[in-house]
């Protein structure tokens, strides 16, 4: 399965949460990390007390697991517009960064792994919501 990792899932993985680590090991044939997630993580690192440690851990995660980073390009931007319009039309709201994450997921045809239940309103992607 192509797994696209949300910010909260990376945080769980880095903390060694067994459910998350096991799910990724069992189902993650290919692991993708949207650039938007990397931005959210770096924001947390910068405002935290262990910036260098956390940045090194993220780099190791990307390098050791051969994680593919999904960049925001014109194709992702078009998918963002499609998803956002669909959400507006049905009166659903999710954080803007999460629309970008969903668009990134749609771009690679992956399944989003997250703890955020609001992704269930995004019809264009498959989502696994960890409890």
Regions found by a protein language model. Name each.
Residues 1, 102, 106-131:
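Acidic, PIN/NYN-like endoribonuclease modules and their adjacent C-terminal/linker elements
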Residues 6-7, 41, 80, 105:
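Generic structural signal for small/hydrophobic residues in well-ordered secondary structure
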Residues 1-34, 45-60:
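Short, well-structured N-terminal submotif of metal-dependent ribonuclease cores
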Residues 68-113:
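Active-site neighborhoods of divalent-metal-dependent phosphate/nucleic-acid chemistry enzymes
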Residues 47-52, 87-88, 129-131:
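Short, hinge-like loop/turn segments at secondary-structure boundaries
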Residues 10, 38-41, 119:
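A generic structural signal for short hydrophobic patches within well-formed alpha-helices
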